[in-house]
Structure formats: C-alpha cells, structure tokens
A protein has these predicted regions:
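Bacterial Sec-dependent N-terminal signal peptides
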Residues: 3-4, 11, 15-48, 52
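Long, charge-dense tracts
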Residues: 34-238
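Short amphipathic, basic-aromatic surface patches that mediate peripheral association
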Residues: 234-258
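Short beta-strand/loop motifs in extracellular/secreted proteins, especially
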Residues: 261-263
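Eukaryotic beta-sheet cores, primarily in C2 and C2-like/PH beta-sandwich modules
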Residues: 265, 299-349
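Tryptophan-paired
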Residues: 274-318
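C2-type phospholipid-binding modules
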Residues: 332-400
Length: 400
C-alpha cells in the first residue's frame, strides 16, 4: 500500500548506497517553449484596469489557499473556472461572488490585442486557463485593503531580483504603470503579485484530509494515520509505529519568486514482516510512505508539528541493527519521473532478508538526504531532533 500525503504549514546513520535510476515519461512535464510565458501574463496583469474589487478577489483566493494548507496562490485554473476560490476549494465556489471578475478583464484585453497579431485569442485563453501558471502573493496577510500591487514574474533562472510593474491611480483617476526593480524586501513592504508556476495543487494537504475524513484526527497531539484493515501480527515481540513529530527547514531551497519549498519525505520498508522462508518472502511487497511537506518562506528555522505516521507494523527482531529501511528527503524541482532503486533488509528468526525498493522522484529534484537507517537508530534517537542535510526531523517510536 502506498500512502501519499501532502502536509503544508504552513543525522543519522548513513549507509553508502549506489542508486539506480530509470527514466519514465512524465505527462505533466512543462514544455520549455510553453505557449504562454510568465512574463507575458505579468504584462497583461499590469495593463488591465484592476481595481480594489479585483484586489479583494485575488486576496480572498490566496487567503483561502493558505487556509487550506497550500501556499498563498491563485491558480489560473481557479481564476477562470471559479473566480475568488483558492486551491482546495469547491469548484463552484465564488462563481457568482464577483460581477466583473479578473478573468473578464484578461479576456477583454487578450481579444482586443491579440486579434491583431498572429495568435488566436481563444487558443491563448484556453492555454492560460489550463496551464500551471498562478498568481503568488507573498506576505498577503499584510495588505492594507487599498494599495495596488506591483506585478512581476519568476525569471526561472535563480535570480532574486526582477523587473516589475507598479500600478498607480492618481487623484484624478488617471491610471499609469511604472517599471521598478522588485526583490523580496519590497514584497514584504508593499503588495507584490508574482506570476509563477504551481507545484502543489495536485496533492491533498493535511488540512484537506482532515475535513474529508475525520478519522485522520484533528491535529495538535493527535497521530495522523489512515484507518486500515487488520494486519497480520505475531504473538511474540512488540509492534511499533514510527511517527514523524516535527519537521524544520533551516534554509530556503528556492528563490522567493518560486514561493514555498516543497519536500518529499519517503520511507520504504516491509510492514509486519513474518516470513520464515524464501517462498513466504515473495508474498510481501515493500511499503513506500510518501509525504509532501510544503514549508513557507517565513517558516524557515521554525519547527513544524506534523504528528504523521511513517512506518507501521514494525516488529523487533533478534538484532534490531539488521532491520533497515530506505529513507530519502528531496526538494521538488520537477523534471522527468525517475526512481531510486535500493535495498533494505529485515532480520527474522536468525535470518537476514534483503528486498528491493523503488522510490519515485523527479530528475531535477534536490536530494536533501538519502540512505539506509536501522530500526535501532530510531529507538536510540527517540524524541531528539536529528539533522538530515539542511532540514531537521524529530521522530517518536510508539509501541502499540
């Protein structure tokens, strides 16, 4: 079984392993020559006659996304289909709340300007609405309710500074745009809309999972674990559960234009392993628990409480140091689908059993840490934080 969870807020014993990677086609891979460019969308937003009602629309959407556990973002998909709704909201929310939503201004502008160019307006609008492009509004909670935004875009080259367009309306109602230099310091002082690409809308946050299934718990000190069918148990030995209590990011992994950092915490193991023969061993499939954790930029250096189950059905054997799991932390940067092929092992009744584990990742991901961990290490560490590269994790071993 594979549990894939997205959590938003928002070292160890290392065994050298030579990873093997196999490429897979990725249908969601972004075409580098995308029909709709980030810079183009930023220019459109700077040219259309935005007023306070449109500001409130975007602010409501990014606030809703943040409340649903995502970053402060307003996707083009939501902007065109359900104005004012955030990531995680119902598709029908907000459709009648805005008599002249932002999408109408964008459509009017595109039809009036691109009809004269060698580009079909309908095709452009369709491509924009179906793209991964979004408006990211950092520090949106500081908006005073009236200041117009500076519009910029992610240069996607690692830069921390870019050109932006400041929207101003004079006392006589005359509207004009001035070109400015935008950095994160400016974004903390005045409203800045960053046109960038979404990378988290395809996953459910812990907040969304709690709403959909009360059995997941209510947060705080509760353990978040999906209800499961009864599992095989042994009469001898204790059965333990590994819980990831806290996660702390010690530096931002992406430029501020890209928004939050998305981490995948992956652990591969054999659950409730009781095989006594090679034939029985073939009946077991490795489990891969895969958490996506999104940490906002203002949460760097701050411990985030998760209380998420990583590994269940863990029985102590005669030699706990012989029981190993495969563990990896990556920071998502996209690319083609690959996998980390490695080995882990369990020790039962005096015998050591090795098994293959394939853990998925993307080709451009930053590998924060990967390796093999023995179960005894978790027992010895229990409750104390451990460093894994530039992140810090706190585990707890629970006996159930």
């Amino acid at each position: 079984m594979k549990d894939c969870i997205k959590i938003v807020f928002a070292s160890a014993f290392v065994c050298a392993i030579m990873p093997g990677c196999q490429d897979f086609p990725d249908e969601s891979k972004k075409d580098e020559s995308s029909f709709v460019r980030l810079e183009e969308v930023a220019e459109i937003l700077a040219m259309i006659p935005i007023d306070c009602n449109h500001m409130y629309e975007v602010h409501h959407a990014v606030s809703s996304s943040s409340g649903n556990g995502y970053d402060e973002e307003y996707t083009m998909r939501n902007l065109f289909i359900s104005p004012g709704s955030g990531v995680g909201d119902s598709p029908t929310r907000g459709q009648t709340d805005y008599p002249e939503p932002l999408r109408d201004l964008i459509e009017d502008y595109v039809y009036s300007t691109k009809s004269a160019a060698q580009m079909d307006p309908d095709e452009f609008i369709s491509a924009l609405a179906e793209s991964d492009i979004q408006i990211y509004w950092p520090f949106s909670e500081n908006w005073d309710g009236e200041t117009m935004p500076v519009v910029t875009f992610d240069p996607e080259d690692g830069s921390d500074v870019n050109t932006g367009y400041r929207l101003k309306v004079d006392d006589d109602g005359f509207r004009h745009v001035e070109e400015v230099v935008v950095d994160e310091e400016m974004a903390a002082q005045v409203p800045v809309w960053v046109v960038n690409r979404n990378s988290d809308a395809g996953y459910a946050t812990i907040e969304m999972l709690r709403r959909e299934d009360p059995d997941w718990g209510t947060g705080g000190g509760n353990i978040i674990v999906r209800p499961r069918e009864a599992v095989r148990t042994r009469s001898e030995g204790s059965c333990k559960t590994l819980v990831l209590r806290d996660f702390q990011m010690n530096r931002n992994f992406d430029t501020w234009f890209a928004g939050a950092s998305e981490f995948f915490v992956k652990i591969g193991y054999l659950e409730d392993f009781t095989a006594m023969t090679e034939a029985e061993m073939r009946l077991y499939d490795p489990m891969v628990t895969d958490f996506m954790i999104v940490v906002k930029r203002n949460q760097v250096g701050i411990s985030q409480n998760l209380n998420a189950v990583l590994m269940t059905g863990w029985h102590e054997g005669e030699d706990k140091t012989e029981n190993r799991c495969a563990f990896m932390i990556t920071e998502d940067d996209g690319g083609t689908r690959t996998e980390w092929s490695t080995k882990a092992k369990v020790f039962v009744e005096g015998k050591s059993y090795g098994f293959e584990i394939s853990i998925p990742l993307s080709s451009r991901d930053d590998i924060v840490w990967r390796g093999s961990l023995d179960y005894d290490w978790f027992d010895r560490l229990d409750g104390s934080p451990a460093s894994f590269g530039d992140v810090q994790l706190t585990f707890e071993v629970m006996e159930l």
